[in-house]
């Protein structure tokens, strides 16, 4: 497939809003692709280059891309930045610049999809400061051979932000339709290998290839997620339920095979180097080959420390021994996905729990199983008294569903209205805060697109604003006066008094008294609040207000 053909598919998708229409367009494109083209097409159409489980990073930020565009088009850097600021969209700005370029490439060639992929993966393998020139050179050569339309999507892919609204669910359905296989088989394979690109390649071979895929160590699996609910509702729906403490720590996945062991974060990043003490504890706790799911917390004086203490350990890359002395980490394991060559995710939770207690023992999270609401309520109060966030309620007969947020896991914690939102823009601060960003534009998601919801300017200490500035300064993609826009990569937890209907933001809502709570380093922008869930919150809020006034 030529990259120009891929760009035409993207342009068609960009003008669609209906999910079924998107599925149709993608499913038409997939069958004619060669086996080596399928993984590339699928990842690219979702704005990705590497599978979620991969530790590879492209390493091209906005500034490197702007320099590559400058060289490819033969224009001044100021021209590139001005056009991007005017457009507010890197892709369309690059398209305009390439349409008017005066510099001609004498070695022009038609770009092929796999060729572009190979060049980009080559960029990712180059490390160190001296590699920046080589990254710019490769990006410049690709852009130099690109048509204006190709340039629009090539630039966005380099920033891994395609902005055409295609999410995993859409692509899963398109794969099933294109190759006439059961969508449950596509889901099974995705749960096992966590790479829709590879799933598409297997689907082309047929249903047997999909069903033969299994979970393996050192290939992290997306973690099962919980939604909000009530104790009464869970008992009414399921009778007997399992209650566990909800820890204010960081989710982890522990993989062990033989003498080798690694740990992965909620975002599937390998954090083994930062947590050698936790790996050592779990490795000594079991002699089996396992994949475990759990939460690690920081402990001081037998009490859990704040979430930020855990994050500091996850971020640490140097002076690990010193950090181990300062912050003691304790793992709490609550599930097992793999044991000695056997995938366990389809087993009922109570069976997985029995295996877990046999295999690990010491670090298994405490659990209470009951049909009695008062017993579960007491467990909830015990959790709060011990300094934890609340409790998790789980259905004993439920399977483990990687990456899904369903009714089989429910979180119960004190009523605090917060949302996890992506940071997409900011304004510079004033006075003593003029050297950092002072307020932030945050967004929810809707069908794979980020939708502005509110601005957040309170709740930050000076130290936190400096930390956020350091995290975001290299992610700036455009500037207009005091306003900047970011490549979306950071998630804030934002508190608020209430949701209000508002025409100010594209979401149609605004937050009353929004305040910064914390950075969610453990989440990426695909896990933020959806517009649908915000509508649901608003409806529940309205019903509560009506009940109060009666």
UniProtKB/Swiss-Prot annotation:
InterPro entries: ATP-dep_DNA_ligase (IPR050191), DNA_ligae_ATP-dep_bac/arc (IPR022865), DNA_ligase_ATP-dep (IPR000977), DNA_ligase_ATP-dep_C (IPR012309), DNA_ligase_ATP-dep_cent (IPR012310), DNA_ligase_ATP-dep_CS (IPR016059), DNA_ligase_ATP-dep_N (IPR012308), DNA_ligase_N_sf (IPR036599)
Active site: 246
Disulfide cross-links: none
GO biological process, any: DNA recombination
Positions that bind ATP: 244, 251, 266, 295, 334, 405, 411
Keywords, sorted A to Z: ATP-binding, Cell cycle, Cell division, DNA damage, DNA recombination, DNA repair, DNA replication, Ligase, Magnesium, Metal-binding, Nucleotide-binding
UniProt catalytic activity: ATP + (deoxyribonucleotide)n-3'-hydroxyl + 5'-phospho-(deoxyribonucleotide)m = (deoxyribonucleotide)n+m + AMP + diphosphate
EC number annotated for this UniProt entry: 6.5.1.1
Segments passing through the bilayer: none
Pfam families xrefs: DNA_ligase_A_C (PF04679), DNA_ligase_A_M (PF01068), DNA_ligase_A_N (PF04675)
Cofactor: Mg(2+)
GO terms for MF: ATP binding; DNA binding; DNA ligase (ATP) activity; metal ion binding
Enzyme class at the top of the EC tree: ligase
Family note: Belongs to the ATP-dependent DNA ligase family.
Its biological purpose: DNA ligase that seals nicks in double-stranded DNA during DNA replication, DNA recombination and DNA repair.
Protein's name in the database: DNA ligase
Organism encoding this protein: Methanoregula boonei (strain DSM 21154 / JCM 14090 / 6A8)
Gene from which the chain derives: lig
């Amino acid at each position: 497939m030529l990259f120009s053909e891929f760009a035409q598919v993207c342009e068609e998708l960009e003008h669609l809003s209906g999910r079924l229409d998107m599925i149709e367009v993608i499913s038409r494109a997939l069958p004619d692709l060669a086996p080596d083209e399928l993984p590339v097409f699928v990842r690219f159409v979702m704005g990705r280059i590497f599978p979620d489980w991969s530790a590879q990073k492209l390493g091209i930020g906005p500034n490197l891309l702007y320099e590559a565009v400058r060289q490819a088009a033969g224009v001044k850097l100021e021209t590139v930045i001005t056009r991007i600021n005017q457009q507010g969209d890197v892709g369309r700005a690059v398209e305009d610049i390439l349409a008017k370029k005066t510099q001609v490439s004498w070695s022009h060639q038609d770009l092929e999809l796999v060729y572009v992929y190979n060049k980009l993966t080559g960029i990712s393998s180059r490390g160190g400061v001296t590699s920046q020139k080589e990254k710019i050179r490769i990006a410049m050569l690709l852009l130099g051979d690109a048509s204006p339309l190709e340039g629009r999507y090539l630039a966005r892919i380099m920033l891994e932000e395609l902005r055409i609204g295609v999410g995993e669910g859409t692509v899963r359905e398109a794969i099933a339709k294109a190759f006439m296989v059961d969508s449950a088989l596509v889901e099974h394979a995705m749960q096992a290998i966590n790479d829709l690109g590879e799933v598409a390649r297997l689907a082309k071979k047929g249903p047997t290839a999909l069903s033969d895929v299994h979970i393996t160590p050192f290939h992290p699996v997306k973690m099962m997620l919980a939604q909000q609910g009530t104790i009464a509702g869970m008992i009414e729906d399921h009778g007997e339920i399992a209650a566990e403490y909800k820890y204010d720590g960081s989710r982890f996945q522990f993989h062990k095979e033989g003498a080798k062991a690694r740990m992965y974060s909620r975002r599937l990043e390998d954090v083994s180097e930062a947590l050698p003490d936790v790996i050592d504890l779990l490795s000594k706790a079991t002699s089996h080959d396992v994949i475990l799911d759990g939460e690690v917390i920081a402990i001081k004086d037998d009490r859990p420390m704040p979430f930020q203490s855990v994050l500091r350990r996850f971020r640490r890359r140097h002076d690990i021994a010193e950090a181990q002395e300062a912050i003691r980490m304790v793992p709490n394991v609550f599930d097992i996905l793999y044991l000695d060559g056997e995938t366990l995710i389809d087993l009922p939770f109570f069976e997985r729990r029995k295996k877990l207690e046999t295999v690990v023992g010491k670090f298994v999270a405490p659990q209470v199983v009951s049909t009695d609401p008062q017993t579960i309520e007491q467990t909830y109060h015990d959790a709060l008294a011990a300094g934890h966030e609340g409790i998790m309620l789980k259905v004993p007969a439920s399977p483990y569903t990687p990456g899904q947020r369903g009714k089989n896991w429910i979180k119960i914690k004190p009523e605090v209205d917060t949302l996890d939102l992506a940071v997409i823009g900011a304004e510079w601060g004033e006075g003593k805060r003029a050297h950092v960003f002072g307020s932030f534009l945050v967004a929810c998601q809707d069908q794979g697109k980020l939708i502005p919801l509110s601005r957040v300017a309170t709740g930050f200490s000076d130290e936190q604003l400096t930390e956020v500035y350091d995290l975001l300064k290299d992610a700036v993609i455009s500037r207009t006066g005091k306003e900047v826009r970011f490549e979306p990569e950071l998630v804030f937890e934002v508190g608020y008094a209430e949701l209000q209907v508002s025409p100010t933001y594209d979401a149609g809502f605004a937050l009353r008294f929004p305040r910064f709570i914390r950075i969610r380093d453990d989440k990426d922008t695909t896990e933020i609040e959806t517009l649908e869930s915000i509508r649901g919150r608003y409806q529940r809020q309205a019903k509560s207000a009506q009940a109060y006034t009666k």
